[in-house]
Amino acid sequence: MLAPALNLPKWLEENSHLLQPPINNYCVYHPSAPATQGYTVMVVGGPNVRTDYHINPTPEFFYQHRGSMLLRTVDQSTSPPTFQDIPIHEGSLFLLPANTPHCPVRFADTVGVVLEVPRPENATDCMRWYCKGCGEIVWEKKFHCTDLGTQVKEVVEEFAADDEKRKCKACGSVRSVRYEDGEVVQPPRAPE
């Protein structure tokens, strides 16, 4: 028997406490569940002001349910790579291509839904931090992703705990784990 449709506003009323830092997400559909094989669907809340960029070997689908978010991306097809901020407004959809470094910045009282497909068995995800000063890669860690919520948290905590990992080899500045207040500005709720 198929499960009933998920009423997102009702789910949020009853479960918003599950959207806790540092990752702020909750998996409502998991690929290991018989009824939802092939998809991971996460409800993601704000604020999330981590500075890490995730590189997923598969595409990611974003739907912004409440408020607006900023998806910071890196276009690696240019030399040097181009940093591009993509606002995703309330009610908007966005499909992020596979292997695109991205840093989803979510603000207070915002909620989105992210859909992912399972990674191929030999695929690796990557968590990466770029230097705020010179744009070089400060540190990265690759891993085979089997549990996004726990594995991302572990890598973020590993980076946060080690000042040497946070130090840029090119210019010597130290990368913070979180954006400072005012460093990233929330886009308007709707496109202008």
Swiss-Prot record:
Cofactor(s) required, per the database record: Fe(2+)
Binding annotation for substrate: E60, R106, E116
Single GO BP term: anthranilate metabolic process
GO cellular component, one term: cytoplasm
UniProt xrefs under Pfam families: 3-HAO
Gene3D superfamilies assigned to the protein according to its UniProt record, in alphabetical order: Jelly Rolls
EC number: 1.13.11.6
Keyword presence, Cytoplasm: yes
GO MF annotations, alphabetized: 3-hydroxyanthranilate 3,4-dioxygenase activity; ferrous iron binding
Catalytic activity: 3-hydroxyanthranilate + O2 = (2Z,4Z)-2-amino-3-carboxymuconate 6-semialdehyde
Cell location: Cytoplasm
Residues the record lists as binding O2: R50
Sites where the protein binds Fe cation: H54, E60, H102
Pathway: Cofactor biosynthesis; NAD(+) biosynthesis; quinolinate from L-kynurenine: step 3/3
Residues holding a divalent metal cation: C131, C134, C168, C171
UniProt-listed InterPro entries: 3hydroanth_dOase, RmlC-like_jellyroll, RmlC_Cupin_sf
Keyword field: Cytoplasm, Dioxygenase, Iron, Metal-binding, Oxidoreductase, Pyridine nucleotide biosynthesis
Role noted for this protein: Catalyzes the oxidative ring opening of 3-hydroxyanthranilate to 2-amino-3-carboxymuconate semialdehyde, which spontaneously cyclizes to quinolinate.
Family as reported in the entry's similarity comment: Belongs to the 3-HAO family.
PANTHER family listed in its UniProt record: 3-HYDROXYANTHRANILATE 3,4-DIOXYGENASE (PTHR15497:SF1)
Name of the protein in question: 3-hydroxyanthranilate 3,4-dioxygenase
Gene name as annotated: BNA1
